[in-house]
Amino acid sequence: MADARSIRQQNQRSWDAVVPAHASHHRDVPTFVRAGGSSLFPEERALLGDVQGCSLIHLMCNTGLDTLSLANHGAVVTGVDISTAAITQARQWASDSGIQATFIQADIYDYLAETRDTYDRVYASYGTICWLNDLHAWANGIARILAPNGRFVLVEFHPTSNMFDAQWQLARAYPMGGRQLDIEGVGDYVAASGGGLSPTGFAAGVHDFVNPEPCHLFQWGVGEVVTALASAGLRITRLDEYLFCNGERPFADMVELPGRRMVAPPHVPDIPLLYGVAATKE
């Protein structure tokens, strides 16, 4: 069995392969953010609070559209991601838009252990937890880089949604325990969202992308995430669950509401599809 670092390096290769496909579906990001546009949803904005003048780091920031949006809300932003392709794209969008942002390519565990910087806000969102092989090292790293009275915010896909197959039938056990899940590769979920993840305007871009690089996920329950943060000395101030998805369409028959909000079709009972956590360092 591969060691954790080798797994993360393989995941980096999978992300590097898919980033050009994802980026191809966004129309003119620099113009969008230069005009003050924001890709953020109300849920993360509410949990983050007023970020005007705050130093903020966006962990596992991908290509940085949300990071640049946070700058438009007044934060002094840094984004960190393991993918070289993602950080290259983020830096290009920042340069072309004139938005001030720092983007760092690094393994998240290395960054959290080695940086000397601290931040008023630490933010992670939408598909980050599944790439973490060690929740406690992650949470301890967050506590380390938070400034006193700083706030950590997570908005994430609810693991309950992974229990269902494409027809909304219960098919799998609740994801937890850090079980490793090996899949063919990071897919083109931006294309599959049909514009839900392209607030700048959807472009057809790359068609029928197939990732040649497999990847490896880790399955964690909500309780495990919250416990890791609390064990790191953070005080949990909010734990919210939401009966909708923002942007992404994990089931093909989801109904899109205004604001790029995706809900289950009428015949499906409500289940939590997202959750949000806010925690402070005291």
Region annotations inferred by a language model:
Residues 1-29:
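N-terminal, positively charged/glycine-rich alpha-helical extensions of SAM-dependent methyltransferases
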Residues 136-151:
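A short glycine-rich, Lys/Arg-flanked "PGG" loop and its adjoining helix->strand segment in the class I
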Residues 27-54:
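Conserved alpha-helix/loop element of class I SAM-dependent methyltransferases that forms part
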Residues 232-234, 256-258, 262-282:
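Core SAM-dependent methyltransferase catalytic element
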Residues 113-122:
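A short acidic, Gly/Pro-enriched loop at the edge of an enzyme's catalytic core
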Residues 54-111:
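Class I SAM-dependent methyltransferase SAM/SAH-binding core
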Residues 151-203:
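Conserved class I S-adenosyl-L-methionine
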Residues 216-239:
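Short alpha-helix
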